[in-house]
């Protein structure tokens, strides 16, 4: 009797525990299975938490329950969940730490630039006035070479005037104008006329001021005769072969003359068979290229191999960019061309500052030519933006200029670029499916700045900083800025 009561009490306790934790009633049938001779227990559902659905509705529920009911499997799943939460927590802490480190690097770079500015201002105040005036006089002497002219015999001048030149001189009676033919595109025709006359004048200027070389000996007899006419009886003193000085003189005195409406209307490239090799190539490319868009000018520029000609074309394009139409949104290829111009002008301070001013000055109209726009609903007009690659190339150029130890101070430009990155960065969603967002920098005008930047949320800013903190080029440039201050102190 005691054994039966003990069995009943154990069965009762088991039934209560099962019902307590699983809300399921168990009924033990008193029949035995034929194989194992053990009582068979049937379970009935009464709103249980785990077994609240029968097997017909979810056929895999019983298998899932058996899997989790095993102690080893439950421990394995729990361990994986804990490990996953630990990895997520660690990754979050690392991301926050890198974001803070990047912000601290930007602040350290700005503080470093401020200290350098104070030191330079103190040094400038302590310099005597005569040293500054002497430096300005040296610049004037360097930029404007002296040319001494010797008086020629009037008979010699008259004979020289009668000699032939590479460009045949025509009288009014020799010209036969076809009035029915009109210029198909005035801007492209003007660009061709301007580029041709500029490079033709530069080739003469180059051959006149420099000593005779093997390249000049290979020129045609007509071209050498033209050079001799320009140098005969004249003695050149203190002249320097500076491209920027030549371009300023040509642009100021001759560009408007050779590109007057009448001359542009009737402009045709002359017979260039007697020209030097470089000028022959230029004339051939100008003839084959329509030169109507900036993309076509990019093709023309990319085929040129002479660094001198590329510098002249870079100076010319900055002053004549109005000849090419502006795209409103799709300017990806134009921004690539801007990067090429910046990269080619790294060794030329003046050209680099010209093109960097397009980014530094938001009112520069050339931003609409080179950079794609972002439609901003807050101001209801497009806003130009630059890529992170373009930004890093500009910042690198100014840091290189500052590290060369030149007499000019570029701390203000570097400081402004850091502020632009810190305030104007935003995320641009990539149209490709598997590509993440990219960081771009807005270039708003002062009157639109607060409205446009107000649309960028703090969460988007933090995401931008996270991406920037992982960009090796940006982090390395910020470190170089801090190192400049450390070396100077």
From Swiss-Prot:
Other information: Present with 450 molecules/cell in log phase SD medium.
GO CC annotations on file: mitochondrial inner membrane; mitochondrion
Statement: the UniProt record of this protein carries the keyword Magnesium: no
Encoding gene (name): PET494
Subcellular location: Mitochondrion inner membrane
Function: Required for the expression of the mitochondrial gene for cytochrome c oxidase subunit III (COX3).
Protein name: COX3 mRNA-specific translational activator PET494
Membrane topology qualifier: Peripheral membrane protein
Gene Ontology MF, one: translation regulator activity
Gene Ontology biological-process entries: positive regulation of mitochondrial translation
Keywords, sorted A to Z: Activator, Membrane, Mitochondrion, Mitochondrion inner membrane, Translation regulation
Signal peptide annotation: none
